[in-house]
């Protein structure tokens, strides 16, 4: 769950994302068409490496926070979300690794202490368990079906642990679409470290130019571009672009735009 303060999901957001008719897209055009890289000539995309959150919808986690702590839910959720990613970046910079589940729980404890809520053992477990049972966004299943038929290989490349990716994939019934569930825990670091992005190249055994990285957060899109991946930002929150001297090759609000981009 790859984000800075601009990329936080508002726990009170009720924005609906309408399922789109991507299943009707022409399969052959998706598979055969080259992609124009911003810094070079035409290239052929052979695989897509997804961050977890263009696929999985994390909003129920923050809805549960509001349900359990109605008076301080917004403050708790925002503090938790911010600290979660700050801890991954701090641990990456310091070279002291803890897996994403542990980091997420540490951030939750910090947020509870800061906001003064009574985080019981039962509440703590309930919130952490929600990260193991995320559903997909409404536009995901038809898009995955289209991509699968096209012959493009699909993988996750996420800061989430392997256990989280496997559990959510099975819960949401999308595990059959993904060839690899690549967690950055394999490298004992987090994105945007180049070592983390290199996992996609190593596991898929493709050139980085042949792997489209699909980011959820603006900072992750920037990190993937720094590494050298052609990059599409699935900007579901409508966040402004980062000021990091790079831009994704494409951007859109959902999976329809992603498929149109690679057609």
Regions found by a protein language model. Name each.
Residues 12-31:
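N-terminal export leaders
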Residues 29-41:
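Bacterial Sec-dependent signal peptides at the C-terminal "C-region" and cleavage site
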Residues 62, 77, 81, 101-109, ...:
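An amphipathic alpha-helix signature
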């Amino acid at each position: 769950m790859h984000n800075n303060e601009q990329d936080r999901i508002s726990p009170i957001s009720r924005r609906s994302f309408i399922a789109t008719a991507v299943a009707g897209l022409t399969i052959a055009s998706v598979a055969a068409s080259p992609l124009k890289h911003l810094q070079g000539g035409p290239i052929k995309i052979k695989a897509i490496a997804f961050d977890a959150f263009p696929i999985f919808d994390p909003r129920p986690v923050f809805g549960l926070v509001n349900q359990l702590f109605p008076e301080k839910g917004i403050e708790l959720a925002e503090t938790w979300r911010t600290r979660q990613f700050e801890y991954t970046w701090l641990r990456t910079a310091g070279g002291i690794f803890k897996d994403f589940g542990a980091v997420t729980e540490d951030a939750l404890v910090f947020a509870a202490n800061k906001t003064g809520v009574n985080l019981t053992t039962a509440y703590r477990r309930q919130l952490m368990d929600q990260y193991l049972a995320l559903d997909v966004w409404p536009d995901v299943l038809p898009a995955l079906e289209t991509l699968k038929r096209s012959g493009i290989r699909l993988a996750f490349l996420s800061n989430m642990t392997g256990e989280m990716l496997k559990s959510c994939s099975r819960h949401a019934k999308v595990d059959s679409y993904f060839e690899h569930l690549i967690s950055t825990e394999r490298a004992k670091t987090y994105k945007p470290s180049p070592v983390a992005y290199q996992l996609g190249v190593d596991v898929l055994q493709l050139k980085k130019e042949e792997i489209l990285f699909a980011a959820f957060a603006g900072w992750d899109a920037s990190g993937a571009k720094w590494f050298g991946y052609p990059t599409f930002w699935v900007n579901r929150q409508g966040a402004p672009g980062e000021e990091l001297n790079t831009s994704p090759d494409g951007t859109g609000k959902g999976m329809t735009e992603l498929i149109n981009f690679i057609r």
